[in-house]
């Protein structure tokens, strides 16, 4: 592929890669015009810490343990690690490369294949959906953090009006059990519920009733609306957004400094909780329950689907933060090392978080004299705000301290993730409108985020959270990630992409990356997405089905996100006609003049490098079929010839 728009003065050069110094043509295209220099990270460590803070987040401590438990326990680690190496790492590295190579955000990088610009806008839509409910989780976390400073944890005892309540205090739990009360094992919703011997009245733990009746004031039917926002949660939501704005207001200059704390502090707390958890009675049973493999689950396609969903959720690929962070790197930054560190650390943290959480749940089962730990595990929001508080309230020594540490850790993890997501949206807007002040865009989007989050702090908010996460987050991000990979590797071309990497990183791309990007990663993602669509079932909240109107709204949400891809593609074609529609379509699938490194000097060297590569391949061309075959194999495998 010979590049035009910026040509070496003599048409060729004997220099190579970054060392090329030939003068370029005096005529400048749009791609060469001076642009405002992009702010860079203070140092490479800030970038690494920022990536850790977004990838090592709530998904590791909150979502991974239950996902693993639901999908084969220890056996889930096998498909998860396979998915990590065949999908997670390749997608993570690819997004890092795209961001650093172009120094552009999620939308602007699509100068590589302009007809695919809708992928960037669709990912922005999915990111907005995730931001909208993620901030409400921070509000819940802040609420529990604040009330943990009381002399007695408020969820550890029953209110007078709760006639079906059992205190979460350790001794009183035992007293109730000894008088003939047994734990119900009917559904995930009743994880802490206890049923009397005559089973005429279901009893629930005070931690569950506190969350449902005091904190979220849960509605079991949203057909008549979701209700009004709770003022306490609204205040907590406001505080969360103030913190988010303060972190992102100066771009990477402020978020880069905060990243050290956001990335490292959770590990301090996690290790403190781990040490405390493994010393609790019953912890061993909980850990074994988490790690014990259910080998039969490996043949279940749903397990592999959940491994992919968890990998995407945990690493934050497909939604833009990795591209955005990498776009603020220096062009020659060593991202290969960072990609390997973050993806490996993410997996180890998930395992560490799972061991810690199930050690605590094992202690909870021990205190309740329950043999099957399955009965104390709850999915979704309930795991963080019912099971964990219930277990912490039974700590014999200073439960308030461990409660404060735990919820502060969750808050920091959540801030690290949402800061990256919010910065992605701000970067997209600032890339599009160069003259706009970053802090003003950050303030405006933060206000919008707060207003969107109000619906989630209503009595029916958990219903909306489940709906938006399912339709607007998971599936929108997943399908657009497939188009993202296809656009870069199949449309722009694997060889072109690998040449760009070689120029930027000064190293050939190994066979592992080439095989994953061109075959394993896209094929696995397509198969899993099709399977997910074929086997999709109506979603439920707390064992209750959503109203039909809610499901229609959910599918509409998915359609809006997915439709960004074709609609923006058609928009580009209509704005750049090339005579016939077919010619316009073909032109939209070729790189625009703006594709390439943002720095004009580096761009000129890159054009020389690419033209040299094209010339080398032309001279190596063999007319025989066998020679042609071996040349293609050599190029695919990364041969230096």
UniProtKB/Swiss-Prot annotation:
InterPro entries: Na/ntran_symport (IPR000175), SNS_sf (IPR037272). In larvae, weak specific expression in the anterior midgut just proximal to the gastric caeca reproductive rudiments, common ureters of the Malpighian tubules, and distal swollen portion of the anterior pair of Malpighian tubules. Expression is also seen in the imaginal disks of the head; brain hemispheres and the ventral ganglion. Stronger expression in the posterior midgut. PROSITE patterns: NA_NEUROTRAN_SYMP_1 (PS00610), NA_NEUROTRAN_SYMP_2 (PS00754), NA_NEUROTRAN_SYMP_3 (PS50267). Residues 9-26 have a biased composition (Low complexity). Residues 1-40 are cytoplasmic. One of its GO terms (molecular function) is amino acid:monoatomic cation symporter activity. Pfam families: SNF (PF00209). Residues 1-38 are annotated as: Disordered. The keyword Ion transport applies. GO terms for biological process: amino acid transmembrane transport; D-amino acid transport; glycine import across plasma membrane; L-amino acid transport; neurotransmitter transport; neutral amino acid transport; sodium ion transmembrane transport; sodium ion transport. The chain crosses the membrane at residues 41-61, 74-94, 111-131, 229-249, 258-278, 307-327, 341-361, 401-421, 447-467, 474-494, 516-536, 552-572. It is found in: Membrane. Keywords: Amino-acid transport, Glycoprotein, Ion transport, Membrane, Sodium, Sodium transport, Symport, Transmembrane, Transmembrane helix, Transport. GO terms for cellular component: membrane; plasma membrane. Residues 27-36 have a biased composition (Basic and acidic residues). Glycans are attached at residues 185, 190. Belongs to the sodium:neurotransmitter symporter (SNF) (TC 2.A.22) family. Unusual broad substrate spectrum amino acid:sodium cotransporter that promotes absorption of the D isomers of essential amino acids. Neutral amino acids are the preferred substrates, especially methionine and phenylalanine. This is Sodium-dependent nutrient amino acid transporter 1. It comes from Drosophila melanogaster (Fruit fly).
């Amino acid at each position: 592929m010979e590049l035009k728009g910026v040509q070496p003065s003599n048409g060729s050069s004997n220099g190579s890669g970054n060392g090329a110094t030939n003068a370029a043509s005096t005529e400048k295209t749009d791609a060469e015009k001076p642009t405002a220099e992009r702010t860079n990270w203070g140092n490479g460590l800030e970038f690494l810490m920022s990536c850790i803070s977004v990838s090592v987040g709530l998904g590791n401590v909150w979502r991974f343990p239950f996902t693993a438990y639901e999908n084969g326990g220890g056996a889930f680690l096998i498909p998860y690690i396979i998915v990590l190496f065949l999908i997670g790492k390749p997608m993570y590295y690819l997004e890092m490369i795209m961001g650093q190579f172009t120094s552009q955000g999620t939308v602007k990088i699509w100068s590589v294949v302009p007809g695919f610009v809708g992928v960037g806008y669709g990912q922005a839509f999915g990111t907005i959906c995730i931001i909208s409910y993620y901030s409400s989780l921070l509000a819940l976390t802040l609420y529990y953090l604040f009330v943990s400073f009381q002399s007695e944890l408020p969820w550890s005892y029953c209110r007078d009006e709760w006639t079906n309540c059992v205190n979460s205090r350790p001794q009183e739990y035992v007293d109730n059990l000894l008088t003939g009360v047994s734990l119900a094992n009917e559904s995930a919703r009743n994880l802490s519920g206890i049923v009397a011997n005559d089973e005429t009245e279901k009893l629930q733990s005070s931690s569950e009733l506190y969350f449902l009746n005091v904190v979220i004031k849960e509605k079991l039917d949203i057909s008549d609306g979701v209700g009004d926002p709770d003022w306490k949660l609204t205040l907590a939501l406001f505080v969360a957004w103030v913190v988010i704005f303060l972190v992102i207001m100066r771009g990477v200059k402020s978020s880069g400094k905060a990243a050290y704390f956001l990335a490292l502090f959770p590990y301090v707390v996690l290790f403190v909780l781990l040490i405390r958890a493994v010393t609790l009675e019953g912890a061993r049973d909980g850990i074994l329950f988490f790690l014990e493999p259910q080998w039969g689950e490996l043949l279940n396609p749903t397990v592999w689907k959940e491994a992919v969903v968890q990998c995407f959720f945990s690493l934050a690929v497909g939604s833009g933060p990795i591209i955005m962070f990498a776009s603020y790197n220096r062009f020659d930054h060593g991202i290969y090392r960072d990609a390997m560190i973050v993806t490996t650390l993410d997996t180890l943290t998930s395992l560490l978080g799972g061991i810690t959480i199930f050690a605590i749940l094992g202690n909870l089962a021990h205190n309740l004299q329950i043999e099957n730990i399955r009965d104390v595990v709850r999915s979704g929001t309930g795991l963080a705000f019912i099971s964990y508080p219930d277990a912490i309230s039974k700590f014999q020594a200073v439960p308030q301290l461990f409660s404060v540490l735990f919820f502060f850790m969750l808050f920091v993890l959540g801030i690290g993730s949402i800061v990256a997501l919010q910065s992605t949206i701000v970067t997209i807007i600032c890339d599009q409108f160069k003259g706009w002040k970053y802090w003003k865009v950050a303030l405006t989007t933060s206000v919008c985020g707060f207003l969107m989050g109000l619906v989630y702090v209503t009595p029916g908010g958990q219903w909306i959270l489940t709906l938006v996460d399912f339709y607007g987050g998971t599936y929108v991000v997943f399908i657009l990630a497939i188009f993202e990979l296809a656009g870069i590797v199949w449309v722009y071309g694997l060889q072109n992409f690998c040449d760009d990497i070689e120029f930027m990183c000064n190293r050939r791309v190994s066979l592992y990356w080439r095989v994953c990007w061109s075959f394993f990663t896209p094929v696995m993602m397509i198969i899993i997405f099709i399977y997910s669509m074929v086997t999709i079932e109506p979603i439920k909240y707390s064992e209750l089905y959503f109203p039909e109107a809610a499901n229609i709204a959910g599918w509409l949400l998915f359609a809006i996100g997915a439709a960004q891809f074709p609609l923006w593609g058609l928009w580009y074609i209509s704005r750049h006609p090339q005579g016939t529609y077919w010619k316009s379509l073909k032109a939209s699938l070729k790189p625009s003049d703006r594709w390439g490194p943002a720095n004009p000097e580096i761009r000129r060297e890159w054009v020389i490098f690419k033209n040299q590569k094209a010339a080398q391949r032309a001279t190596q061309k063999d007319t025989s079929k066998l020679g042609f075959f071996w040349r293609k194999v050599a190029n695919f495998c990364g041969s230096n010839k």
